[in-house]
Amino acid sequence: MLKLLFALCLISLATDSIAEDRFGGEPGEVRVYKTSAGAERKLELYFPPGHDPEKSTVPGLILFHGGGWSGGTLDQFRTACAYFASRGLVCATAEYRMLGKGEKPPKGQSKKGVCVTDAKSAIRWFKQNAGELGIDPDRIITGGGSAGGHISALATMNPDLNDPADPKDINTKVVAYLWFNPAFAPEDQKNPEIDILTHLKGDIPPAIVFFGDKDKWKTDWHTAYAKWKELGAKNIDLRIAEGQKHGFFNKGPWRTVTLIEADRFLVKQGLLTGEPTLVMPATGEKMVAAP
């Protein structure tokens, strides 16, 4: 009987957790950006109201979900994409190949490297189809949450890990980053291809980074942050949420707070205009700018 009650409690906790962590947001327009390992890799597109690609071009934003390089879904950034599309960007949230438990990567590749390769393909597809989408390929923003933050960083900083089928004349350079507690793991140093520290440069495009002060990944972020500053980077805007853990931006008022701060950051970079259309929560949550 006690075992049954314990099991029911675990189910209840799991259900409550799922209910709290629902990302929300409607799916965007689905496109296939490549086929790898026999499966279609898709992204979802969101357009500004009344956007006419034949009459105007706007900046593009492509985001990558988290999930430990082996899980996660597109719905993590659907709300963000819908919001930034309403503000004037063409947005995409892209999936990528994830290796399940016990599944080995192709010979000569790593579990995380496979993710990065697909992310590079997604960014290239976004740029290659700029005319149809009505975006400026020279004003692309990227980012992601947790593992997605790591993947977006390596996809734009590491010149290797390319899919041979990708167009070689299209690069993965971007003009800004939106990083939501990016996960830079210390064990990555064993593999330079996926190690952020190997690919840091002082001329990083402007970035805004969100972390909870109780996030276990924050220490590893600070290692990269310190090296970036040593290299002369001065355009990384680090924001800290007091009392918050990893993934805090996914739910409740913190999602709104981080989207507003990201909006203001993009306005500062000349990639958006006007004021955020979201309203800061009345409950008083706010981010603290880190030195």
Regions found by a protein language model. Name each.
Residues K216-H222:
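Conserved alpha/beta-hydrolase "acid-adjacent" motif
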Residues E20-S56:
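N-terminal cap/lid segment of alpha/beta-hydrolase-fold proteins
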Residues S121-H199:
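Primarily recognizes the serine-hydrolase "nucleophile elbow" in alpha/beta-hydrolase
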Residues E44-Y46, H222, L231-P291:
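C-terminal catalytic histidine-bearing segment of alpha/beta-hydrolase fold enzymes
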Residues G28-K34, A39-K42, G60-I135, T156:
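Serine-hydrolase catalytic machinery in alpha/beta-hydrolase-like enzymes
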Residues D203, I208-F211:
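Short beta-strand/loop motif that positions the catalytic acidic residue
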Residues L4-L13:
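Sec-dependent N-terminal signal peptides
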